[in-house]
């Protein structure tokens, strides 16, 4: 279905954008629910190439879906080759291409007569590579070095968008920051007293073991722990075991719009990241999402998380890898209704004022229109 309603507003030409990912889930909140949605709402047409079959989902009706293989662990080249084919086939039909994975730099390099290409930098690529369990330790330093070279080349030949201000230091020039904000609802329900939630990717480095331990500690107090998100292969067996024992609820992957509804009325939202290089500079999106839904945040002390929670007094900061402290924070918020309501309300007000996606969406769309050669 073409999302075209574009040229009615006084000469602004409709842009056709090709968006590609082989790493992210097709329902990724940043890619689909924020960026693509903003382009479609502005009257542009989007073809979205992503691993639909591999992830067991259908393309939304408001994009043209193209199926790609998923780049999983070491099987990345087949996915990159497939993306390169799509890119070559469509290069004459689209005005602009947006790629979301460093791997896809290899899909666009050296293709002649290509439209402008935008790389949306989601993470600290060199630091992230040191976290990949499938990459042997001896390969990590040379791969990190190659990643830096690749980033330098990308900056010379492509347009860049950054998900974090903190990533700017890796590049020579200034680039537009499109922050990981969220849709902040017009009103929210006050936080309840019997359920804590975790929303996001689940892995060891993101605190999956601590979350399970917290659930065990809270069982006698009848506070349920609900995890929502895709888990990496290393964590799945442990999670399945915990679910079988009745320790917690794990809802696996849910589309972002459905997952966010699960935050309403929770007692608190958890962010249990470990102290890893990739997490030091990035703003955990889930914290903004918890605040946007009016629930207090319980987070480990990664610098950006502390900055948010302490600035707005919207939750509790707990030590690294300390399930007992997390459980105590949950019980403190459960027992002190005034404090729970106040922290939830302050977080909501701050999110509404400072982290509401439509405010950034306008800048994002205008920048893409400019790169596609359209005057808005």
Label each PLM-derived region with a short phrase.
Residues 17-18, 188-216, 225-226:
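Conserved donor-binding/catalytic core segment of Leloir-type glycosyltransferases
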Residues 54, 224-237, 252:
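Glycosyltransferase donor-sugar binding loop
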Residues 30, 206, 255-262, 269-291, ...:
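Nucleotide-sugar-dependent
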Residues 19-78, 90, 167-169, 230-232:
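N-terminal strand-loop element at the rim of the active site
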Residues 261, 338-369:
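A charged, aromatic-enriched C-terminal amphipathic alpha-helix characteristic of glycosyltransferases
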Residues 37, 84-91, 106, 119, ...:
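Membrane-proximal helix-turn-helix segments that form the acceptor-binding/catalytic region
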Residues 236-268:
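Nucleotide-activated donor-binding/catalytic signature segment of Leloir-type glycosyltransferases, i.e.
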Residues 311-312, 316-323, 332-337:
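Conserved acidic donor-binding segment of nucleotide-sugar-dependent glycosyltransferases
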């Amino acid at each position: 279905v073409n999302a075209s309603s574009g040229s009615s507003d006084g000469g602004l030409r409709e842009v056709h954008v090709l968006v590609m990912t082989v790493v992210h889930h097709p329902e990724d909140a940043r890619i689909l629910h924020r960026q693509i949605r903003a382009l479609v709402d502005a009257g542009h047409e989007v073809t979205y190439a992503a691993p639909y079959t591999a992830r067991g989902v259908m393309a939304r009706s408001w994009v043209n879906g193209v199926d790609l293989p998923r780049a999983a662990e070491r099987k990345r080249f087949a996915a990159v080759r497939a993306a390169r084919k799509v890119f070559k086939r469509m290069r004459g039909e689209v005005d602009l291409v947006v790629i979301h994975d460093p791997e896809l730099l290899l899909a666009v390099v050296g293709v002649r007569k290509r439209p402008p290409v935008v790389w949306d930098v989601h993470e600290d690529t060199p630091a992230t590579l040191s976290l990949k369990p499938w990459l042997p330790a001896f390969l990590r330093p040379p791969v990190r070095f190659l990643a830096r070279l690749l980033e330098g080349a990308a900056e010379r030949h492509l347009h860049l968008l950054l998900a974090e201000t903190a990533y700017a230091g890796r590049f020579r020039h200034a680039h537009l920051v499109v922050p990981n904000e969220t849709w902040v609802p017009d009103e929210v329900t006050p936080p309840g007293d019997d359920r804590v939630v975790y929303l996001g990717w689940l892995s060891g480095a993101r605190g999956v073991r601590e979350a399970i331990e917290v659930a065990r500690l809270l069982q006698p107090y009848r506070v349920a722990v609900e995890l929502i998100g895709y888990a990496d292969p290393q964590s799945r067996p442990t999670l399945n075991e915990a679910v079988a024992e009745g320790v917690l609820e794990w809802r696996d992957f849910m589309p972002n719009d459905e997952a966010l509804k699960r935050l309403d009325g929770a007692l608190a939202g958890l962010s249990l990241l470990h102290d890893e290089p990739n997490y030091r500079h990035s703003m955990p999106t889930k914290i903004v999402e918890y605040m946007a839904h009016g629930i207090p945040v319980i987070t480990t002390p990664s610098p950006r998380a502390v900055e948010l929670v302490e600035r707005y007094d919207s939750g509790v900061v707990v030590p690294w890898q300390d399930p007992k402290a997390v459980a105590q924070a949950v019980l403190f918020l459960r027992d002190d209704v005034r404090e729970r309501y106040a922290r939830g309300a302050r977080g909501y007000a701050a999110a509404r004022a400072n982290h509401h996606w439509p405010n950034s969406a306008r800048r994002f769309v205008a920048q893409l229109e400019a790169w596609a050669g359209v005057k808005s």
